[in-house]
Amino acid sequence: MIILRARDRVLELGSRAWLMGIVNASPDSFSDGSRYPTIEAQLQLARELLASGADIIDIGGESARTDRPPVPLDEEIERVVPLIARVSGELGAIVSVDTYKPALARAAIAAGASIVNDVSGLRDPAIAELCAETGAALVLMHTPVAPRQRLQNPDLYGDITAEVLAFLAERVAVARAAGLDFEQLIIDPGPDFAKTPAQTIRLLSELGRLHELGRPLLMAISRKDFIGALTGRPPRERLAGTLAALAHGLDAGAHIFRVHDVGAAADFLAVRDALAGGAGPSKDLLLAEELRHDRPAAAGREPEARTEATG
């Protein structure tokens, strides 16, 4: 068991996987921004993610895409802060804000965010000072370049895992010097950030080494480029690869998984946990009648055609 402190919350991690559902308040998100263009649509998405099994809602207002211009700060605040207030207030959710900007982080925390997901690798120490002041948890992610810069250099790293460990250990020290409690910190190895697919795969294959840092591990692996490189599929068709990466992360002892497809991830975890043993399901577990593939046809309805054996 490992403790994470996030403002007034004390979270116990380790007994099960935690799911961080993604809500993009940016219309140019690489994955699904254009599908949820209004705050009402984004709030409904958050509601659905929570109902599907999300433990945390991660909200961001600027796409990580490098082919888009930066979003002005006031516009990003306008996108994100009202949504955070409603997801935190109306839905009672644990909210993470995806930002590296201190002014946005401060406004987000005031609106109800409990976690700052900083994808810059703590490039601005003011983020750490803010989290120390407010008690918000802080995600420390590995990246050797500034946000929104793309770097694909197959010769950038020697022992990539050792270099990521050293970088994150130094970032932990910076955060602690700013006044953060050790239990406020989360570690993210930064898949795809300034890494080729091969480098990301090598790093994640050695994920267990990051436990040396003593903090919860966040795996942000949903629909990532390394999955696309392995499967040849575009972002919205990378669910199977995402679940495979999730399974590997579980085996390596990761704690939190940032995913778009929360329902599928929750289903995967339910089946995996049941088959892994432990307490096991109740002896009274039965399939609901409406879920049977051979259920009787309703009056006036033709039986469904069966094109494939299910047994």
Residue map of PLM features:
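Catalytic domains of carbohydrate-active enzymes, especially glycoside hydrolases
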Residues: 44-60, 252-253
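Structural motif
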Residues: 17-20, 138, 184, 216
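Hydrophobic "anchor" residues on beta-strands that sit immediately upstream
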Residues: 20, 54, 94, 114, ...
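N-terminal carbohydrate-binding accessory modules
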Residues: 1-16
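Active-site-adjacent loop and "lid" segments of alpha/beta metabolic enzymes
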Residues: 4-7, 31-45, 64-92, 99-103, ...
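N-terminal binding-site loop/beta-alpha segment at the start of enzyme catalytic domains
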Residues: 12, 17-39
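Phosphate/pyrophosphate-binding loops at sites that engage ATP/ADP/AMP, CoA/4′-phosphopantetheine
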Residues: 50-51, 169-184
